[in-house]
Amino acid sequence: MAALMRVKDSSRCLLLLAAVLMVESSQLGSSRAKLNSIKSSLGGETPAQSANRSAGMNQGLAFGGSKKGKSLGQAYPCSSDKECEVGRYCHSPHQGSSACMLCRRKKKRCHRDGMCCPGTRCNNGICIPVTESILTPHIPALDGTRHRDRNHGHYSNHDLGWQNLGRPHSKMPHIKGHEGDPCLRSSDCIDGFCCARHFWTKICKPVLHQGEVCTKQRKKGSHGLEIFQRCDCAKGLSCKVWKDATYSSKARLHVCQKI
């Protein structure tokens, strides 16, 4: 009988101890809830937001034992991208609460710029570097849709810009030079003029007509030795010795005469 009484007493003590522990745990839970509500009221959060935040923290503690658990533990509730730290964005699924997730890297799918990591932006549903997104609009599309010049029917240089990448830009419409204008070749001058040397430069000079003094070129390429170079005689004329010149003259005079 004494042993039976001892067993009953020990079971009663255990039941009493369990009841005390349950009461203390319930009181501790209520005090934590009150503390969270006080913090949320001071921080300007609504009760729903504080509940979501506590749920997210509990979820992180539950998965804290694995590597995946660590990433889930950092997914804090949010309402916009501004509430997340750098390198994260506010993910809003169709079902479930919003949470801060890791940003999307280059060539990953996206719906907005905020989803992409710093230095990239969302373009056509894919995260691309900012430099590429800036340059892309300036490169014409390679779809062959080019407009013709209404006046001449040719493709304009602007439409063919993607073909001219890396090539020097075409010159502006060339304006022919008049007498005294600088030049590089005779084609730079208007009709009736040639490009001739004048001191250390070349300028447009008039082509010689009949009776005008000319320079007889004895050797090919001797124009380069002249400081004041003359143009050649006009078409149908030739640079010949003047017949009335005196034979005693060492430097015989040449003029443009008919062939």
From Swiss-Prot:
Polar residues bias spans: 47-57
Keywords: Developmental protein, Disulfide bond, Glycoprotein, Secreted, Signal, Wnt signaling pathway
GO molecular-function term, one example from the UniProt record: co-receptor binding
Gene Ontology CC entries for this record: extracellular region; extracellular space
Function: Antagonizes canonical Wnt signaling by inhibiting LRP5/6 interaction with Wnt and by forming a ternary complex with the transmembrane protein KREMEN that promotes internalization of LRP5/6. DKKs play an important role in vertebrate development, where they locally inhibit Wnt regulated processes such as antero-posterior axial patterning, limb development, somitogenesis and eye formation. In the adult, Dkks are implicated in bone formation and bone disease, cancer and Alzheimer disease.
UniProt domain comment: The C-terminal cysteine-rich domain mediates interaction with LRP5 and LRP6.
Protein name: Dickkopf-related protein 2
